[in-house]
Design a protein with these regions (language model features):
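Alpha-helical transmembrane segments and adjacent TM-loop junctions that form the membrane-embedded core
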Residues: 1-12, 35-37, 41, 45, ...
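Histidine-rich, glycine-flanked metal-binding segment
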Residues: 1-31
Length: 299
């Protein structure tokens, strides 16, 4: 992902969303459309979400130092998690408001709603496609893209609702479409939030530990594998550490070569980017791959 191009896209999308948010708020107030106001609220939240993602993107580019020896890449994961939570809250709020609108219907000016919603749809589609390219390999950009996608869907719902209201006065369609959009966004936001949470909790990124064990034990020098940890540091960087039991008479040079061979095979077959191995002779020889407890005695 080109960092400079991503930066330009963030700036462009932010400015575009500020303009459309103002337009949709005014249009929603004058038309009385909940779908249009919900779209405006989406856009307002998007402005904050985009700024948050952009700041995290800039922070993630900082170099490693004595205080952040791993670097700052997880700033983007934190931003993705925050944006996911924000999207969940917004979805729930819009769902509740739509239900209330069924019981307390208001007059809606379909003409104003239609014009403003079409403008919103066009700008939201532009924003969505601007962020789409970088959203595939970065959870932070993905969370921003989902914001854009949710707004585009809200705009589509607003356009459809405006047409039915303007020509046939079908006002109940406005809250129905809002409910459908809020449920879709809730589903997408939940997935992003859980993915970000798994990274922050250093969960196993679907690496088969049985396969890890088989690969390392395929080397005759390795007698046992224990205290294995595999986690995703960021979207595209998987790390692993493990203890291996080897013969006592193995020399330092031979041990280094063994590390290199194991590391190469793990990277080739399981796409693990960074591997740390600790060799032992007798200690832990009978331990399992995953040792129960909090691991305070690991060293």
């Amino acid at each position: 992902m080109n960092k400079d191009h991503t930066t330009k896209r963030y700036v462009f999308v932010t400015l575009l969303n500020v303009v459309i948010t103002i337009a949709e708020f005014l249009g929603g107030i004058f038309s009385g459309s909940l779908a249009l106001l919900s779209d405006a609220v989406h856009n307002l939240s998007d402005v904050g979400a985009i700024i948050l993602s952009f700041v995290a993107h800039l922070i993630s580019r900082r170099s490693r130092n004595q205080h952040k020896t791993f670097g700052y890449e997880r700033a983007e994961t934190l931003a993705a998690f925050t944006n996911g939570v924000i999207l969940i809250v917004i979805s729930v709020v819009l769902f509740v408001e739509a239900i209330q609108r069924f019981w307390e219907p208001e007059h809606i000016h379909g003409g104003i709603m239609l014009v403003v919603s079409i403008i919103g749809l066009v700008t939201n589609l532009i924003s969505m496609f601007a962020m789409h390219r970088d959203s595939k390999g970065n959870l932070n950009v993905r969370s921003t893209f989902i914001h854009m996608l949710s707004d585009a869907l809200s705009s589509v719902a607003a356009v459809i609702g405006a047409i039915f209201i303007y020509f046939w006065n079908v006002t109940w369609l406005d809250p129905v479409l809002t409910i459908l959009v809020s449920l879709f966004v809730l589903h997408e936001a939940y997935e992003i939030t859980m993915k970000a949470a798994n990274v922050l909790m250093e969960s196993n990124p679907n690496i088969d530990l049985t396969k890890v064990n088989e690969i390392m034990l395929s080397f005759p020098e390795v007698k046992n594998v224990h205290h294995v940890h595999v986690w995703r540091y960021s979207d595209n960087f998987i790390m692993m550490d493990a203890h291996i039991n080897v013969d006592r008479n193995l020399q330092a040079g031979e041990l280094e070569q063994l590390y290199q061979k194991i590391g190469k095979k793990l990277k080739e077959e399981l796409c693990i980017n960074h591997i740390t191995l600790q060799a032992e002779c007798e200690r832990g020889r009978n331990d399992k791959m995953i040792v129960s407890g909090r691991g305070n005695n690991e060293n």
